[in-house]
Amino acid sequence: MTESITWPFPWPQSAIAQYTAYRVNTPPQIDGRLDEACWQQAPRSPRFADLITGQPAIHDTRAAVLWDDDYLYVGYWVEEPFVEATLTERDALIYEDNDVELFVAGQDAYYELEINAFGTIYEVFFIWEEAFDRAGYAQQPAFDRSQPGVRPFDGVGFQPHPRGRRIGYWHWDFPGLHSAVHVDGTINNNQDRDRGWTVELALPWHGFRALAAPDGRALPPRPGDVWRMDFSRFNQYKAAPPAQDSGGWAWSPHGVWDSHVPELFIQVCFSTESV
């Protein structure tokens, strides 16, 4: 049988990106600058491409991943000639600004983080509804479905997903998250030309317990373990026609206007090679 028959998702399985995450010998300072040697030596992603078509984006965006026994580290380099942001309240709808996004998937749940050039964070924890009881989430007070900020979610452009509906926890905050943004220019001042902004994240492994529990994955990962992650950028502007710019760019495209497809997330392998 061909992949088009057996693979029910809108981007070829063979085209999903893979990445090797190196260990850090000295943890980076989370200041958003990405100027430590470990970030300079870490393999960077290719230039992000359009989320739907895979065509080159008008501005350069790249990401890299590092790790140690305590944290998962993620860095973004964002070319932006006119850096802009408006939202300052935590869990505001950051995708209505220009942002970068991180998704991390477990077997039965996934985590979403968005951040703008002000460093404002938006987070959601999603659980597949069909796994809610089976995976043990129903027994955890933190995932009581009667709480404020809990509601069903059916995805965005890829519907219906083969696994069905998710339960979203919009009040959930990643335990111990550290984040920082550095703007190389002047934010919200379009009288000059900026170079862009960089984002630095440190997510402690203990914060992934709810994600890791259903399949018993090791925290921190064992060398050779593979996790699914997604890295993207969304803009309130688009390249002029004839460019086919959806306004969403990703390390590994999805073929549809929807980041919420864990099966299309990048395969990140944790290496013992260090930087």
Identify the meaning behind each predicted range.
Residues 1-275:
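Structural preference for beta-rich elements and adjacent junctions enriched in aromatics
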